[in-house]
Amino acid sequence: LEVISSLNPIPGTIVKEVTKMEKMLVRGVTKDNDVARISIVGLTDVPGIAFKIFSKLAAKNINVDIILQSVGRNNTKDIAFTVSKDNAPIAIDAIRELAFVGDDTPITCDTDVAKVSVVGAGMETHPGTASKMFEALFNSDINIQMISTSEIKISVLIDAKDADRAVAAVHEAFL
C-alpha cells in the first residue's frame, strides 16, 4: 500500500508488513560503570526533604539518575540516589551543608555498583518487559539494588562485579 498526495507528484509512504526488527521491543542493552550510590538514612519524614536535597545537588550541577525513597516509618524515611563517581564526594559535601542533615545522619556511598539498562520504544505499554529482565538477572543470581523505568528504558543498579554477566544474561533474554 502506498499513501500519496493527489496534489503532489512526489513518491508517497509505503505501508508494508512489519519486519522482525520492528517487532523487537528491546533494541539494546547498556552498561554504565561510572556510577555511585549515595544513601541517606533516617531523614525526618516531612514535606520538602526531597526537594531540598535535590535542589542543593542541582545548584552544584550534579546530575542525579536513579532515585529511591523508602516508605516512611516511625516518622523517618531513607533516600538513595545515583550520581557519577566523580560527583559523589561533592554530593555528600552538599548534603552535609543542609541544616536538617546532622553530623550523625548516616550517609553512605558505594562506588562498586553499575547500571544495566534495556532500551527500546514503548516499554510502558508492553506488560512483562521488566519481569523478563528481572528473570534473566535472577537466573544469573544477580541481585537488584535499585530500579528505574521510563517509556524507553528500564535500568537496574547492581554490584559492579556482576555487570558483564548481567549484560550477557539480559542480552540473551531479549535479543
Question: Model features per residue range: what roles?
Answer:
Residues 1-149, 153-175:
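C-terminal catalytic "cap/lid" subdomain
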